Amino acid sequence: MKKVTINDLFMMKNREKIVMITAYDALFARLFDDYVDMILVGDSLNMSFGGKNETIGLSVDDMIYHTKAVQNGAKKAFLVVDMPFGSACTPQIALKNAIKIYKKTGCDAVKIEGTKEMADTIKLLSQNGIIVMSHIGLKPQMSRFEGGYKIKGKDELSAKSILEDAIVLESAGASLFLLEGIVSSVASEISQKLKVPTIGIGSGASCDGQVLVWSDAFGFFDEFKPKFVKRYLEGATLIKNSLKEYADEVKNSKFPSSQYEYTK
């Protein structure tokens, strides 16, 4: 099975939609690998995997551990790793951490949240051979600072600012973009103006591809569902029903039956 490369993704822009999903371990990465073009080891793991209410709190070593696990399961998909909160606060710190992630995980790219102020950081990383996905629009790592998760591009000033971010960061060397929580018309304009692929989450259908957090898409997190999430499976219900059946069989001495026992 051919490994997806950055050149493959460039070729897909305006030709074929790019499919991306999150993964945090080898088991699910292996399941997803045949059906997606890209896998994101996102800091969303702090929420869906760690049970927190925000992405802040992860370390570079946390991301490395989970990326290694995903790498063990996914052999085809283009693998992107989030730079966690605080790991890219200066260009030199970002370079040091990105090199560490690159060397220890074998990932294909790192993702950095930020506006045009991150241009120097992205330029330095790309000059050192590191592929960068720039994350613009709604930036979860800024949720405390902004007082929550707020959709971007609703007014002319906001829309103009996001478009400027995209153009500046592409010029700095960003090879990919993640557009999150952006009004669809604005995301469409960004995708048309950029030469590199855009992956959307909550940013409409005009992006070059889409990404979802796997536990959202498959219904394993049933406490809250954002507007942009389509559930393709009611996973939590299936697991609960299966677990109830297992528990009932154990309580009533129906499992294990002789079929599942070793004999002389």
UniProtKB/Swiss-Prot annotation:
UniProtKB keywords: Cytoplasm, Magnesium, Metal-binding, Pantothenate biosynthesis, Transferase
EC number: 2.1.2.11
Organism: Campylobacter fetus subsp. fetus (strain 82-40)
Keyword Metal-binding on entry: yes
Name of the protein in its database record: 3-methyl-2-oxobutanoate hydroxymethyltransferase
Subunit structure, interactors included: Homodecamer; pentamer of dimers.
HAMAP family, sorted: PanB (MF_00156)
Localization per record: Cytoplasm
Pathway the protein acts in: Cofactor biosynthesis; (R)-pantothenate biosynthesis; (R)-pantoate from 3-methyl-2-oxobutanoate: step 1/2
Chain positions recorded as Mg(2+) binding sites: D43, D82, E113
Cofactor-binding details, from the entry: Binds 1 Mg(2+) ion per subunit.
NCBIfam families: panB, PRK00311.1
Disulfide bond annotation, renumbered to this chain: none
Reported cofactor(s): Mg(2+)
Family indicated by similarity: Belongs to the PanB family.
Function: Catalyzes the reversible reaction in which hydroxymethyl group from 5,10-methylenetetrahydrofolate is transferred onto alpha-ketoisovalerate to form ketopantoate.
Signal peptide coordinates: none
PANTHER family documented for this protein: 3-METHYL-2-OXOBUTANOATE HYDROXYMETHYLTRANSFERASE
GO molecular function: 3-methyl-2-oxobutanoate hydroxymethyltransferase activity; magnesium ion binding
Gene that specifies this protein: panB
Residues forming the catalytic site: E180
Example GO biological process: pantothenate biosynthetic process
CDD domains documented for this protein: KPHMT-like
